[in-house]
Design a protein with these regions (language model features):
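A structural boundary/capping signal
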Residues: 1-240
Length: 240
């Protein structure tokens, strides 16, 4: 509602109606970040679930909202929702092994980490996060901190759920999650390869063959096509 929006903007030190009439934001970018911190973390007490990071609930938005704790990407989505409700320019950044946000206003940019109370992240922090995920030899490149689309953000969130289900050998649940991912990105051929592999792990060779055959019809990846062809032959032998 407008009352809620006015409350958020007031924390940032601004005027809701002035923003709308001018079509631009005149608030200091750090005040915007402080307003996100005040609302998401101080008022509603969201926080990163450091102690039980691998819990499936950390990637389930309904559970995150109920428990007020989650993983980097789920908390990033909460922060992005709050900022976008005010018309602020915010995007998600999918670092390998971590997820952060970038806020922009009046030509200034701030990168912050929703998993750690929306603290500002600098180049040194980015390198450290990258090396934690990819090893000490990894070097920070521009593609590592490029903004990703809302669709890719949702896919990454669902992939976190799927991976946790696979780790627990809940292959049928993982297939359901993957079906959701395919609805989000129906043209993403790699999801058919993932589906084929999951069906194979779930002891459903016919479904695996069907998904992998469809993958072969759509994928240009020679490596993926070879992998799919080998798995199809394995599934056919199970049916013999």
């Amino acid at each position: 509602s407008e009352a809620v929006a006015a409350y958020y903007v007031s924390i940032a030190g601004g005027d809701l109606h002035a923003d709308k009439s001018n079509g631009s934001n005149n608030h200091d970018i750090k005040k915007k970040l402080r307003s996100i911190q005040a609302v998401v973390y101080d008022q509603y007490h969201y926080h990163g679930n450091y102690d039980h990071y691998e819990e499936l609930e950390n990637a389930d938005l309904c559970s995150v909202i109920e428990r007020r704790k989650g993983m980097p990407i789920s908390l990033s989505i909460i922060c992005m929702y709050v900022a976008k409700a005010q018309g602020w320019n915010i995007v998600g950044i999918g670092l390998p092994g971590h997820f952060i946000c970038r806020l922009e206003a009046n030509g200034e940019r701030i990168i912050f980490d929703p998993f750690h109370h929306a603290n500002i992240v600098n180049a040194v922090d980015l390198r450290r996060l990258l090396k934690l995920a990819l090893g000490s030899e990894a070097e920070l490149k521009p593609e590592h901190y490029q903004a990703i689309s809302n669709r890719k953000t949702l896919l990454r969130l669902q992939n976190n759920i799927k991976q946790r289900q696979v780790d627990k050998h809940n292959f049928l649940d993982a297939i359901i999650t993957l079906d959701t991912m395919r609805k989000i990105a129906p043209d993403e051929a790699e999801l058919l390869l993932d589906a084929g592999q999951l069906y194979a792990q779930a002891k459903q060779p016919r479904a695996a063959i069907n998904a992998l055959s469809r993958y072969l019809d759509h994928s240009p990846s020679q490596y993926g096509r070879t992998k799919a062809s080998v798995l199809i032959q394995q599934m056919k032998r199970q049916l013999d």
